[in-house]
Amino acid sequence: MKRKAEKQQAAAPAPMSAVAARKARQQQMQAAIAVVKPSQAESVQEPPSKKARRSPEQAAPTPPASGEPQGRTTRSSKRKAESLKVDKLIEKKEKTLSAEYTEQLPVRSSPQEQEDQSSSDEESEEQNPIVGENDAGIAPLRGDVDGYESPADTSGPIQEFPLSKTRLNKSNIIYSDEHTLCVRIKEKMSLVLLGHYDLWVKRGVVSVMGAKLHPSPRLYRVYAPSTHSLPVIKCVSGVDGAAEIEVKSCHSGIYRLRDLSPLYRRIWNGKNTSADKLTLRTSPSSAKRTFSVLYTSADDSFKRHLRPLHLEKQWSSAIKSLSQRGGRLKALICGPKASGKSTFSRYLLNHLLSPAPQTETNYCNTDGVAFLDLDPGQPEFSPMGQVYLAHLRSPVFGPPFSHPSLDSSQEGTIIRAHHIGATSPKEDPDHYVLAAMDLMDRYRALLASYPQCPLIINYPGWIFGLGLEVATWLVRSLGLSDVVYMSEKGPTEVVMPLGQAAQEAMAPLTILPSQPTDFVSRSSAQLRSMQMQSYFHMTRPTEISNPLWLEKPISRTRPFHVHYAGPKQGIKGVMVMGSQIDPDLLQEVLDGSIVAVVAVESPQAILGQNDGPGLTINHPAQPIDADVTMDDSTDTPMEGVPLQDPINPFIDANIVRTPTENLPYLFVGSGSSNPLDPKASRCLGLALVRSIDVSSQRLELVTPIAGSAIRDALEQSHGIVLVRGQLDNPNWAISEDYYAARAEERRYRESLEKLKKNEATTDKEDSIIEPEQQARVSAILRDRIRRASNVPWMTVIEDNSGHQREAAQREKSLWKLRKKAYPGSDSEGDW
């Protein structure tokens, strides 16, 4: 019995030792697999050494427990020997992989060549300590709980990602100067550019963002910032096996927005790359184009995480299949958030607008493409908070903030738009559905003039819960030809109802994989701010086909002065969506906010205005005398356009004047405001209420809406109503003066440094500025910065020593979207 007990005591530790050895071998094998097949999300760098991956059994040996026989030690040693063999095999693979990776690295330019590169304004910002505190606007949030992760720490070497297949040399460079580059691209080869430029196809056929461009005298404007995947220019077919393109610098002014917001900094091309140097050899040393040729992501001087915009094979085949329907196409694109709906819709749109002549159906698009955007959070051709129907006639190449509105007859126009007042339709699903149905009716009316006009519907990522009910209802009601769902991972509780609705509507359901690797340098909220800022700073001169951006801050922009009371009253009322507010608070709610300018087309323009009571308040309504009639328009830009009266009595019955400011508060509803009927109203655009002048009873509105659009609405006897929704606060407008002042001071310091350098090289003292004058100008600029920083809701960080290091670390960080695929995940995190 004693011997048996000793055997049992000696055998007791055996299972634990076996489990430990088995776990160690599994960890080593998993590490070996991870080394041989690195994931796409990880940076491709030299694998860690053997020492860094020491297994538990490779650590310092521990003495065996008392009473453990030597036989068990021998068995463990045998397993350790097996583990060491596995380690040697792993180490051999690591060395082989490291050698292969080293051989694949391109030859780096010498430090002297890097010093010879010209510096841009953004690069000088990086060298000046004054810039570090300006990056506060893009600081990531820690511990986000709404479906997003903090930026991945990529302090190690940046992954060298291949971008262009074409390498420029003397044989494929036709001509070049400091503004233009003409190259020859062989078939199935590609070229990737960073920046913004005009593209001219001279010979052959090239594809860009889904569009096939044939030789023509037309120039295509392309915007390729680092905030999105870079467009790839690929040769589809050519003459003598190659296509010939000319790329030219363009000066649209969009790069000037970096002086107004840190979100627009470091998104365009930096220093000249090796390819740029090759094509600028005969140009001055300071020459710099608005675009740069990139072979790999390592060519970027800012060391950003750049990726090319490539399509999945399933995406390409689906786009070709859908395009063959021609004018009969009516496709709804839906799926979870961050699944690539907008990218797929943009590719399909461009492909339809530029079909290849050799298509099987011989379809030639002359009627354009209708684009029904039902995503108010991230719209393609309008600022946030709107759903709209657009009629496109030309492909578009760029992110949404490069075309925040459509007013060009050449590119396309907005047929009709409705203001939802929020970035998600879940705030008022009924109003959202009514707006979608009205826009669909407008598309059917558009078919009378353009019978071969296909339709693309972009549905938001609100696909769970109530959003799924809305999506299935739209599938059954809109008479679609196709439904595309952008996720192969389901979930089944979404795919099954969607498939049943598509089957009832006799529309095939196509399931595609979602967009891979969602690494972005700007969050969704930041991209909305960029798009909104671009919307307010963009202008379209009549004599120029492409838009221009002005760098003047909103506070210095000439506003529209609109009377809200009196004989020249220009607006019918002010509506606040959502819950009822006290009229005393209307000025605070309205001042400094973003409002929609809505044209009321019918007396019955408010939903439910005959069903429920109007506004219930504690203050008595002010009597409306002869000076507060709504018969006349405002002085600018609608002065002199008489209004008729059919709409006035119906709106006047629901207007309450605020006791102090005499603002016209329009409210219909019971507890919450009833929205305007989409069938009897349309949104003309957005405006920023810069101030409310109570003494003159006027509003100062800053808006990019053309005065002719408002004048046309008034000539048709349509009343103007300002609608205050639940959009993001215009923080970008508050801080514009501060960033503009810092940019002005930076430019002045750079000019002084340039003069000092010229003085040292030329020994001329004529251009020297007196020290007293320098001090006086510097004091004026610093005072301007101080005054610009003394505004509410903005904190200026004066001590930038630690903040600058954080900003440098953020430049090496990425935002990683964590996709949720379960019911109830329709909420988007506030980054």
Curated annotation (Swiss-Prot):
Chain intervals with Acidic residues compositional bias: 113-126
Entry annotated with the keyword Nucleus: yes
Record-listed ATP binding positions: G335, P336, K337, A338, S339, G340, K341, S342
UniProt keywords, alphabetically: ATP-binding, Kinase, Nucleotide-binding, Nucleus, rRNA processing, Transferase
Cellular localization per UniProt: Nucleus, Nucleolus
Main localization category: nucleus
Enzyme Commission code: 2.7.1.-
GO molecular function: ATP binding; polynucleotide 5'-hydroxyl-kinase activity
Name of protein: Polynucleotide 5'-hydroxyl-kinase grc3
Species of origin: Aspergillus oryzae (strain ATCC 42149 / RIB 40)
